[in-house]
Swiss-Prot record:
<keyword id="KW-0472">Membrane</keyword>
<feature type="transmembrane region" description="Helical">
    <location>
        <begin position="412"/>
        <end position="432"/>
    </location>
</feature>
<dbReference type="InterPro" id="IPR011701">
    <property type="entry name" value="MFS"/>
</dbReference>
<dbReference type="InterPro" id="IPR044777">
    <property type="entry name" value="SLC17A9-like"/>
</dbReference>
<dbReference type="Pfam" id="PF07690">
    <property type="entry name" value="MFS_1"/>
</dbReference>
<feature type="transmembrane region" description="Helical">
    <location>
        <begin position="312"/>
        <end position="332"/>
    </location>
</feature>
<dbReference type="GO" id="GO:0005886">
    <property type="term" value="C:plasma membrane"/>
</dbReference>
<dbReference type="InterPro" id="IPR036259">
    <property type="entry name" value="MFS_trans_sf"/>
</dbReference>
<comment type="function">
    <text>Probable anion transporter.</text>
</comment>
<keyword id="KW-0732">Signal</keyword>
<feature type="transmembrane region" description="Helical">
    <location>
        <begin position="53"/>
        <end position="73"/>
    </location>
</feature>
<dbReference type="GO" id="GO:0005315">
    <property type="term" value="F:phosphate transmembrane transporter activity"/>
</dbReference>
<comment type="similarity">
    <text>Belongs to the major facilitator superfamily. Sodium/anion cotransporter (TC 2.A.1.14) family.</text>
</comment>
<dbReference type="GO" id="GO:0006811">
    <property type="term" value="P:monoatomic ion transport"/>
</dbReference>
<keyword id="KW-1133">Transmembrane helix</keyword>
<dbReference type="InterPro" id="IPR020846">
    <property type="entry name" value="MFS_dom"/>
</dbReference>
<dbReference type="InterPro" id="IPR050382">
    <property type="entry name" value="MFS_Na/Anion_cotransporter"/>
</dbReference>
Length: 439
């Protein structure tokens, strides 16, 4: 990293790499808890509804801090917000014992980890909006967010064996160490964005006057930018982003939190016996997320399609293909078929992020963190609804004497996000735009 900074390696690339590692570690933590808690809870016979409640507590905390996260990043800087958030959740992971019988402690710890991590993604998008020029945004955001999926893949591959040999508590220790390590690296190598690192662009007259004044020795007073809350809340393009963010995270969180249970109970297959195949759905997300970013930037920079058409095209392809794969998933009763369907579904969902997930930087580059906070609030609500509802669906099936190994039991679980994907793609096609609507 030091060698890179000494060379003529643009600092913004270092920032993008660090935010990629940041999202990687965050999702290692989320997948790690789901695996460790599932093993510990199943060992003592915790019912599916209670499991769903504990797994969803993270999202209750997460939803509380999305908009405050965007506001904080706007006011004190995304760099500081990221550092404080990481240190907080890392300390909680390192100090809290994993005991399914101590539900109050688990509820509070997951709530506070959710609050801490809720500041992270609005802060990341504030940082990227400051550092990354428009022609690099699709691939930069896609690379950063692909860290989530690589982290999930790594967690699915590594943690089942760790739990088997070292116990469920060891997962928390590993997560805490990774969190602290990233915090130290971020503190050392990140910085506030200087104007000189970005490619030269024409600056507004106001900025030019400020620059002249600063060069003359004058002090330029920082301007407080008024956030157009009303226009944001009532903007149809923003709502198109919000709806798609909700659907993306509903599908992702249901699969992330309940796919281990589907393998264990639906297919009667131990995660430890699946080898590397269990990481393929998330690794596929990593690959397709970056493909989507590169394709989007190519279409835009070569002027093959407008920004608006590019976002709509990739979003539609991603969500529609994902919907088909989701609804086909419970029809496959073999491990290979399930891995194939979940890989296609999650991979194309990640491809669709080159549509809706970058769009807030198109429509509101100055308020990217705020719009991200608003849309990610919807995404977090999807986690609360989806994860909790799935637990209730499965518990209701058991109460009706339905076997969890029966594919009919799981159809509702996977059909709901499938239909949501189709609905959301239509909304984005109709209402989204790639034009700047907030100055």
């Amino acid at each position: 990293m030091t060698a890179l900074t000494r060379m003529k390696f643009p600092k913004r690339y270092v920032i993008v790499l660090l935010t990629f590692i940041c999202t990687n570690v965050c999702y290692i933590e989320r997948v790690g808890f789901s695996i460790a808690y599932t093993v510990a809870a199943d060992a003592i016979g915790v019912n599916q509804a209670n499991k769903g409640m504990i797994l969803s507590m993270f999202y209750y905390g997460y939803v509380l801090s999305q908009i405050p996260g965007g506001w904080a990043a706007q006011r004190i800087g995304g760099r500081r917000v990221l550092l404080l958030s990481f240190v907080l959740w890392s300390l909680i992971c390192g100090l809290i014992p994993l005991d399914p019988k101590r539900e109050v402690i688990l509820v509070l710890s997951r709530l506070f980890v959710g609050v801490a991590q809720g500041f992270i993604f609005p802060a990341i998008h504030t940082v990227l909006a400051q550092w990354v020029p428009p022609q690099e945004r699709s691939r930069s955001v896609s690379l950063t967010t692909s860290g989530m999926y690589l982290g999930a893949a790594g967690g699915m591959l590594f943690f089942p064996s760790l739990v088997k040999h070292m116990g469920a508590q060891s997962v928390f220790f590993v997560e805490a160490v990774l969190g602290v390590a990233w915090s130290v690296i971020w503190l050392k190598f990140s910085s506030e964005p200087p104007r000189t690192d970005l490619p030269k662009v024409s600056m507004p007259k106001v900025a030019s006057r400020e620059k002249i004044k600063a060069q003359a020795g004058g002090v330029v007073a920082p301007r407080t930018v008024k956030i157009p809350w009303r226009r944001i809340i009532f903007s149809l393009p923003v709502w198109a982003i919000v709806v798609n963010n909700f659907t993306f995270h509903y599908a992702l969180y249901v699969l992330m939190n309940w796919l281990p249970t589907y393998f264990e109970l639906g297919l009667q297959l131990s995660l430890q016996d699946m080898g590397s195949s269990k990481m393929l759905p998330y690794f596929n997300m990593f690959i397709f997320s970056n493909i989507g970013g590169v394709v989007a930037d190519h279409l835009i920079t070569r002027r093959i399609l407008s920004i608006t058409k590019t976002r709509k095209l990739l979003n539609t392809i991603g969500f529609v293909v994902s919907a088909v794969a989701l609804m086909a998933l419970p029809l496959f009763r073999t491990p290979s078929g399930t891995v194939l369907c979940s890989s296609i579904s999650l991979g194309f969902l990640a491809l669709g992020r080159a549509g809706f997930a970058v769009n807030h930087m198109d429509v509101a580059p100055k308020f990217a963190g705020i719009v991200m906070g608003v849309s990610n609030t919807a995404g977090t609500l999807a986690g609360i609804v989806g994860v909790g509802l799935t637990g209730s669906i499965l518990e209701g099936a058991k109460a009706s004497n339905m076997d969890l190994t029966n594919s009919e039991t799981w159809k509702t679980v996977f059909f709901v996000p499938g239909y949501l994907c189709i609905f959301s793609s239509i909304i984005f096609l109709i209402f989204s735009t790639g034009e700047k609507i907030f100055e």
